[in-house]
Each structure stands twice: as structure tokens, then as C-alpha cells.
């Protein structure tokens, strides 16, 4: 007789090989065809809401690993919150205006932007953005992200643009919007102003110069020994091209400055920097004639070294930002080309010179010598001219971090221009209060970071000199130049945009856009022109909380969470906070979670030139999206997140182990009906009770990790549970019970009850992470008739506190530790060919003290627990026994006694007792009758 056929072997059609790249699209189709997203919403309608407001990615390219990480983190949270009973509407969005799209379309059309019809270019940009939205949407859906993909919010939609106009109008009516001349970040390549959030820093080699500024008014501070000699203040600058705009020299009032004789001249600079400057300029600056405090030189005067400027004076001013960290302690000041310079210029009523045009070329104001030169190309000519004039003390090249445009990657400049601003000072205090009192920051350091940024930031430059965006809704009187913006004009423009979108601004005249009968409040005339600038795209995305969350009925304001990369403290988190506080006085979000950047396996930034770029599409093609999701959950996103082929391969192995654990349980519960076959907990075998107790402990740990958004903690907890506690211990031990006991025996049903509960809870706990695989498992599981259609609809499993027993936990934890020592000795015996399988062994356990007590507590089941044929506990030590890692335990391994049962392979003296089955042990003989 073939006794193998009488065993209760696992049966399941759940595939061993995942085949995720091929199988996952089937589940995407299942979710879509069965409208799972909307069915989930209907099931939880009326429940408390958890609204995670999607930060809009930019619609201009394939998604990268950072996008994948971000969207999957959001999806994990939303799926968990749904299981916890929340209504979790998720509306994805896209950012669609701005320079990159405009640049791409101009390049595609092969024309100069000034040659293009505005509406033609805008139409091209519109189509470009929609094309990339479709591509990105498919990529995001392929990651398993569930959301309202058919009704996303898009910043170019008419209703969105209209609400953005209303947000701007509310801020303007509160007095928070103004036009003024200020130094702003300016990209000569893009020919537009930039916001602070649009700046990134990269290393750049720059010529720095030490310039002698002739001193013509010394406040009577020149030492007697210096009189009769030419005196110069020595300034230092890293931007020689800004010398034509110099109008002042800034000193620190509390620093000590020295008058130094050098080559027949007198130089004035910070005393503590004499040695450093002397070395850099190859000059002997040791002959100090006297010293003066900085404050005593206020309102002294130098003369600009360029003679064509007709002895233009440079005022000596005081500034606390002057330090001894670099330079000379005398700071070149050009208010038209620096933010702190500009503030100093206002304080001292200095002229704001900015002899640079929109393309970054020096104008006639800089002088005929430099006119038409690109700013950075002028550095060397300025340096040479100063040398000709005997005003160059020294020069050096330095490498330093310099600001670049994050769109075109070119270096930017500071340029004083007339721009529209949001007056952050008007609501800064309210914003800081909201940061401290209204928002949970995750990680906690995010609070201090954004607090510092908001407290130190300048007013927000919100105008851009482009056409692909939402226009600044301001009109100018053709007669007197007065600008016009009020509630009526804003509402009129908003209504036009609701009908036609922001194209209406260029398609209609000012008179058509304005309410009938509008006249200038200053002069009474009725002819107007429209503002030509558009809004900063950060104003677009910064308005989403009002234009989307506050408007869509399924959402709500303020939202529960914003979740983006840590760079958004100066980007979207901040722009949203500023518009929200300005309009409502409150933060738009209750919590903000930030993650780091994705880097390669060595912690380096991904770069095509380095060749270390990994894209999600390639991982999905080879391994499947669930591996990308597992990578996301396994990473501590608070720091930078590493990825490499090796890391992905390791995660695929972890996935395989988890899948195999689940497949084993599916196969061994195939003939089990929980409703009719389940064994009550108090009647279960103690080992099964232990397994369910550990399941409760796992649920506690996993729930806490989900609640604190520490997904890497739950990843490690579940991985350890599946591979160590289940596969290596519990499931290994109960295999004999599952296979060899009678199919409907209490012993077997007890184990199946435990496995069923473990599987049910594991599926729910893993479904936010391994969404595709858990959906697949759910379709294979035996379920009651009223079970939800999708795993995504299952409620979160409650912790059964009554299963938790500290005494039981201690007992089994102690045994597991001892078992590992015994298993090591068995492995040695197998290696030495004393035994083959562990069932070929009989073990004698020579124990004392604690080890003896632990072993005696499970003595009747000891052979089963050790997966050997016989186990004997002997009190006391024994000569020749194998030592273990414990002093109170030694082990002897010998061949098992008796004969091997043909069915269960356990050796026993009782094999053959049943004459009908002479090769079976009594248990197996009874099991097949």
C-alpha cells in the first residue's frame, strides 16, 4: 500500500512562483472593473475621514524612484487608515504650469518664445501637460496605488484656476499682495524671477578679488603716521561682475580694523584678517599704523575706482552680517544684486543700481567697457580693469556652493526688478503659531526646520515673466497708471476662468474681463491694460488646499496629512501654509510627514553620468510592483533611502519567504472550514495557543508601527514572525500533526484553527504593503459567503487580549532558547553523518537547574517539539555528552530506537503492533482506518 497517499498533504493552487510582473496587471484590472475604490468609499461613507492631500508631481516626464516611494508611502497609510475604519478619499493631482513645460514646448516648436503667439504656445503647453499626466497616471496605478484616478485635480483645470484667482484676491484684499522693486533671484536663461524654493545649490569655481577702494572721507580716524599717503578700504567679493553696482562698503560696528602701511599706501581692513589677506594677496601687512572700531567709520566715504563713474561715492555703512569668516571685514555692497545688500540699502537710503538686463547682460549703465557682456563673462574683464587702475590688491579662485535654477540648472543672479510680492511679514506670526500649535510634524525635527525657514524668509516673490501659468489678475489704468484689484474684479476674472480657463486673460480685452462700468478709482477713466506677469507655480500648488480639499465634497479642510520629500519644507509645505494662514489664519494640514531622498546602494545621488540610476519601471518588469512596495516599507524613510540591484534582490528573497509561509498555511488549511471546524482557544493545544498569543503580540507591534508611520518596524516584525517564529519553529513542529493525524482530529483542527487566524490577520496586516499579493491570497482563501469582494475592504484585526498570557510566553520563550541549543547539536550530528534526518535521532538531554525545569515542563511533547523520534530528559551531567551554549545543559545524540514508521518516519518500538499495517506505528494505523 502507498501510505504516502494517506497523508494529509498540503493542497493549494496558490502558485509557488509569484510571477508578479505577469499577475499584477490582472489585479489592477480586477480593482478597476469591480470599482473597488468607490465601493470602499461607499462602505465607509459617514465614517470619520482621513484625508491625505496629494502633493502634485510635475507633469513633464517619467516617474522616478522618488515618485514611487512617495506615492507608495501615501498608499500604505491610506489603506491602513481605511482598515481602521476611516473614510479615506484619495484624490491624486498634478502640477501643470511653469517654465519646464514652456521650455520644452518652445524647444519642440523650434522658435524663440518672443516670436510665438501666446495662445498658441499655451495650447501646446496644455497638450504637453495632459500627455504626461496620462503617462504618469498609468505608472502610478501600476504601483498598486488606489485612488480616484478618473477624477484627479489638475492645476490647469478651469475650476482650479478660478479658485486660485480667488485665493490671490482674498490675500490682495487683506493687504498681503503688493508690487515693489526688490532684489530677487533671477534666472538669465529663463528670463524670469524665481522663488527661494526654485533654487538649488551646486559647486562652482569663481574668481574672487580683493579691491582697493580709495578712501576720501575718513571721519578723522586716519592715524597721524598715515597722513599724506593714499588710503584705501580693501573690499572682497566673489562676484566681480557686480562691481559696477557698488554704492557702499559695509563694516561690522564691533570689529577692530587696522590701518596698515603696504608699499607706500595705507590699507584699511579687519585687524584679525591681516595675516590671511596678506597670504592670499602675497603682501606684507605687518606694519600696523593704528586701529579703529568699525562703528567709528560710519558715514565715511570711498570713491568708486572706475573713473568713468565720475567719482561716484561709496558710503561706509554698518551691518551685523559682516564677519571674520572670509574676506577682509569690509564688504562690497551692491543693493541691486543682493538680498542683505538691498536691506542695507533701504536702511541707508542708498541708490539701487542694477545695470543688468533680463538676459543677464550688463547695460549702458555699467559703462561702455562692459555693456553687452553676460554677467559671468564680465568677471575677468572687471578684474583686469581693476589691475590696470592699480586697485586690485589680489585675486584667487575658489570653489563654493552657488545658487542655480532648479529648472534649467544654470547659475542665477540677484537682480533688482519690479515684481509682485506676498507680504510674509503681514502674517508671519500667525504662520509660526500654526507651525507650533496646529500641526504634528513627522519626524519631529521638521517643526524646527520649517519654523526657521518661515521666521527668516523674505517676502514671497510671486510674479514670473512667462506665459504658461495663471496670470496675476491686476489691471492698470491707461490714463494714470493706478493698478486695480478688488473683490468685484477678482470675482469677474474667476467667473471667466470657470468658463474658459486662464486662456481668457489673453483671449479677451481688459474691458471684457472687468465688470461692466468699471472705472479707475483714482482718476475715473475706464480704459485698462492687463498685467503681463503670471503667478509663481508654487502659488498654484500652494492653493490646492483651498481649490481642491475645501471644494470637493468627499474631502475636507484642513486635511489630515501632507506627505512629501524633505525639500518641501521650503516648497509645498511652506507655500500651502502661507496661503492658508493668509486667507484663513490657520494651517491647511493637521500633520506633515517628510521622507528623504532616494540614493544608490553607496549613498550617492543617482546620476546618468555615474550610471547608478534605477527606475521603478525596470524593477516592476523584472520583479513586480510588490517588490517596490516592500522596498518602500522596509526603508527608514526619515533618512535618505538606499536602493541597488543587490538590495532589490535581497528584498525579493524576503518576499519569497513570506509568500512561502502563506502558501504553506493555505495548503494546510485547504480542508478546513473555520465556521464548523474551529477549536475554541481554551481547548487548543498549548503550542497552538502560543502561536496565537504571538500573533496578538505581532498585531500590537504592527499596529503601533502603522500608527507612528514606522513602516520599517512592521516590515522587520512580520518578516521575523514569518521566517523565525512560524517557518523555523511553529510550522516546522506542527507538520507531523498536520500530515499524519486523522484529518478531522482535534489535534489537527487545533493547528488549523491557529493557522487560519494567523493567515487572516497576516493578510490584512500586509495588504497595505503587498497589495497585489494579498489580493491574490484573498482570492484563494476559504471565506464565508458574506466576505468582502477585495482584501482592500477588510477591517483591521483586533488584538485578542484574552489570548495573551505572560506565564505561557515566558515558558515557551525559554524553551525556544533551549531548543536552539539542542538543534545545533543535532546539526553537528548530521554533519558528522551520525544521523540523516532529525527523526533518525534519539536525544538524551542532561540538564540541571533552570534547563531541567524548562524541559520537564514540556517533557511529554519533547520529541515532537524537537522533531526527533525519542527524547529523554536526564537530571545531572554526563560524561561524553556534547556541550551546549548553556552550562546547565548537555546533549547526547544517538540512533533512534525501534523501527521507522513507513508513513510518518518516526522510529518506535511499537511499529508493527497492528497486524493489518505491520510497517506503521499505532497512531498512523489508527489514522487510516
Over which residues does each language-model region extend?
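Catalytic adenosine-cofactor/nucleotide-binding cores of aminoacyl-tRNA synthetases and other
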Residues: 404-408, 597-602, 606-684, 783-787, ...
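Conserved phosphate-binding loops in nucleotide/dinucleotide-binding enzymes
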Residues: 112, 202, 333-336, 376, ...
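N-terminal, positively charged nucleic-acid-binding surface of large information/translation enzymes
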Residues: 1-264, 334-366, 391-431, 453-454, ...
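Acidic, turn-prone loop/beta-hairpin segments
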Residues: 95, 184, 188, 194-202, ...
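Alpha-helical recognition segments enriched in aromatics with Gly/Pro capping
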Residues: 217, 308, 348-360, 466-468, ...
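Core structural elements
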Residues: 140, 163, 407, 460, ...
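NTP-handling and nucleic-acid-processing catalytic cores
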Residues: 22-28, 146, 158-359, 431-463, ...
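Short cysteine-rich clusters marking metal-coordination/redox-active sites
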Residues: 187, 405, 477, 520-523, ...
Amino acid at each position: 500500500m502507498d501510505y504516502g497517499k494517506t497523508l494529509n498533504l498540503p493542497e493549494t493552487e496558490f502558485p509557488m512562483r509569484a510571477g508578479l510582473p505577469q499577475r499584477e496587471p490582472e489585479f489592477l484590472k480586477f480593482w478597476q472593473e469591480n470599482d473597488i475604490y468607490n465601493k470602499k468609499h461607499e462602505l465607509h461613507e459617514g465614517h470619520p475621514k482621513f484625508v491625505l492631500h496629494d502633493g502634485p508631481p510635475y507633469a513633464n516626464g517619467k516617474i522616478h524612484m522618488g515618485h514611487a516611494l512617495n506615492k507608495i508611502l501615501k498608499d500604505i497609510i491610506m489603506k491602513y487608515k481605511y482598515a481602521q475604519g476611516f473614510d479615506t478619499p484619495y484624490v491624486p493631482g498634478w502640477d501643470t504650469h511653469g517654465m519646464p513645460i514652456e521650455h520644452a514646448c518652445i524647444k519642440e516648436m523650434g522658435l524663440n518664445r518672443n516670436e510665438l503667439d501666446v495662445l498658441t504656445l499655451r495650447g501646446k503647453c496644455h497638450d504637453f501637460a495632459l500627455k504626461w499626466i496620462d503617462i504618469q497616471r498609468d505608472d502610478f496605478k501600476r504601483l498598486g496605488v488606489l485612488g480616484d484616478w478618473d477624477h484627479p485635480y489638475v492645476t490647469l483645470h478651469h475650476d482650479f484656476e478660478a479658485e486660485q484667482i480667488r485665493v490671490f484676491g482674498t490675500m490682495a484684499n487683506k493687504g498681503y499682495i503688493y508690487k515693489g522693486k526688490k532684489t530677487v533671484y533671477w534666472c538669465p536663461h529663463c528670463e524670469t524671477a524665481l522663488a527661494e524654493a526654485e533654487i538649488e545649490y551646486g559647486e562652482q569655481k569663481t574668481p574672487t578679488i580683493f579691491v582697493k577702494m580709495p578712501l576720501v572721507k575718513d571721519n578723522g580716524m586716519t592715524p597721524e603716521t598715515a597722513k599724506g599717503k593714499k588710503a584705501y578700504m580693501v573690499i572682497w567679493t566673489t562676484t566681480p561682475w557686480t562691481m559696477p553696482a557698488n554704492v557702499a562698503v559695509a563694516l561690522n560696528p564691533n570689529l577692530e580694523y587696522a590701518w596698515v602701511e603696504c608699499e607706500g599706501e595705507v590699507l584699511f581692513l579687519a585687524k584679525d584678517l591681516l595675516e590671511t589677506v596678506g597670504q592670499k594677496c602675497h603682501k606684507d601687512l605687518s606694519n600696523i599704523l593704528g586701529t579703529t572700531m568699525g562703528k567709528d567709520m560710519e558715514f565715511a566715504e570711498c570713491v568708486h575706482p572706475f573713473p568713468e563713474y565720475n567719482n561716484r561715492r561709496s558710503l561706509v555703512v554698518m551691518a551685523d552680517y559682516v564677519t571674520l569668516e572670509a574676506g577682509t571685514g569690509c564688504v562690497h555692497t551692491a543693493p541691486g544684486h543682493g538680498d542683505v545688500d538691498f536691506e542695507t540699502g533701504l536702511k541707508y537710503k542708498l541708490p539701487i543700481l542694477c545695470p543688468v538686463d533680463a538676459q543677464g547682460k550688463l547695460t549702458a549703465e555699467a559703462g561702455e567697457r562692459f555693456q553687452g557682456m553676460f554677467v559671468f563673462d564680465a568677471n575677468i574683464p572687471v578684474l583686469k580693469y581693476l589691475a590696470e587702475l592699480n586697485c586690485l590688491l589680489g585675486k584667487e579662485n575658489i570653489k563654493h556652493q552657488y545658487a542655480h535654477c532648479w529648472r534649467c540648472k544654470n547659475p542665477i543672479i540677484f537682480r533688482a526688478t519690479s515684481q509682485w510680492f506676498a507680504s510674509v511679514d503681514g502674517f508671519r506670526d500667525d504662520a509660526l503659531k500654526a507651525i507650533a500649535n496646529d500641526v504634528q510634524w513627522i519626524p519631529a525635527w521638521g517643526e524646527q526646520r520649517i519654523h526657521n525657514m518661515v521666521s527668516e524668509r523674505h517676502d514671497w516673490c510671486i510674479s514670473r515673466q512667462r506665459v504658461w501659468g495663471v496670470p496675476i489678475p491686476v489691471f492698470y489704468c491707461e490714463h494714470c497708471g493706478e493698478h486695480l484689484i478688488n473683490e468685484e474684479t477678482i470675482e469677474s476674472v474667476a467667473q471667466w476662468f470657470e468658463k474658459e480657463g486662464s486662456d481668457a486673460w489673453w483671449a479677451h480685452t481688459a474691458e471684457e474681463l472687468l465688470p461692466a462700468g468699471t472705472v479707475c478709482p483714482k482718476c475715473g477713466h475706464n480704459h485698462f491694460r492687463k498685467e503681463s506677469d503670471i503667478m509663481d507655480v508654487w502659488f498654484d500648488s500652494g492653493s490646492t488646499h483651498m481649490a481642491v480639499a475645501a471644494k470637493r465634497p468627499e474631502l475636507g479642510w484642513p486635511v489630515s496629512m501632507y506627505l512629501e520629500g524633505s525639500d518641501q519644507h521650503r516648497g509645498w509645505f511652506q507655500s500651502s501654509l502661507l496661503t492658508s494662514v493668509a486667507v484663513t489664519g490657520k494651517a491647511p494640514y493637521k500633520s506633515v510627514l517628510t521622507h528623504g531622498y532616494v540614493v544608490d546602494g553607496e549613498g550617492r545621488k543617482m546620476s546618468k553620468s555615474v550610471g547608478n540610476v534605477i527606475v521603478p519601471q525596470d524593477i516592476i518588469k523584472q520583479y513586480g510592483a510588490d517588490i517596490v512596495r516592500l522596498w518602500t516599507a522596509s526603508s527608514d524613510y526619515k533618512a535618505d533611502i538606499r536602493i541597488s540591484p543587490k538590495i532589490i534582490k535581497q528584498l525579493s528573497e524576503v518576499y519569497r519567504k513570506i509568500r512561502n509561509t502563506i502558501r504553506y498555511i493555505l495548503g494546510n488549511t485547504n480542508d478546513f472550514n473555520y465556521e464548523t471546524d474551529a477549536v475554541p482557544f481554551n481547548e487548543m493545544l498549548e503550542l497552538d495557543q502560543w502561536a496565537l498569543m504571538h500573533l496578538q503580540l505581532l498585531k500590537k507591534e504592527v499596529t503601533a508601527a502603522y500608527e507612528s508611520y514606522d513602516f520599517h518596524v512592521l516590515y522587520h516584525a512580520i518578516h521575523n514572525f514569518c521566517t523565525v517564529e512560524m517557518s523555523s519553529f511553529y510550522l516546522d513542529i506542527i507538520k507531523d500533526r498536520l500530515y499524519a493525524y486523522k484529518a478531522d482530529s482535534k489535534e489537527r483542527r487545533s493547528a488549523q484553527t491557529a493557522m487560519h487566524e494567523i493567515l487572516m490577520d497576516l493578510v490584512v496586516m500586509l495588504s497595505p504593503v503587498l497589495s497585489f499579493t494579498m489580493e491574490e491570497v484573498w482570492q484563494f482563501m476559504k471565506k464565508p459567503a458574506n466576505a468582502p469582494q477585495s482584501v482592500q475592504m477588510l477591517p483591521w484585526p483586533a488584538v485578542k487580549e484574552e489570548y495573551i498570557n505572560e506565564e505561557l510566553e515566558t515558558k515557551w520563550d525559554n524553551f525556544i532558547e533551549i531548543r536552539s541549543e539542542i538543534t545545533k547539536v543535532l546539526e553537528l550530528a548530521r554533519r558528522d553523518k551520525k544521523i540523516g534526518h532529525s527523526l533518525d535521532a534519539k536525544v538524551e538531554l542532561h540538564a540541571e537547574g533552570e534547563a531541567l525545569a524548562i524541559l520537564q515542563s514540556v517533557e511529554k511533547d519533547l520529541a515532537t517539539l524537537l522533531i526527533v523520534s525519542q527524547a529523554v530528559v536526564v537530571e545531572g551531567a554526563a560524561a561524553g555528552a556534547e556541550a551546549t551554549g548553556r552550562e546547565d545543559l548537555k546533549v547526547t545524540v544517538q540512533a533512534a530506537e525501534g523501527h521507522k514508521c513507513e508513513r510518518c518516519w518516526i522510529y518506535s518500538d511499537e511499529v508493527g503492533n497492528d497486524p493489518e499495517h505491520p510497517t506503521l506505528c499505532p497512531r498512523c494505523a489508527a489514522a487510516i482506518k
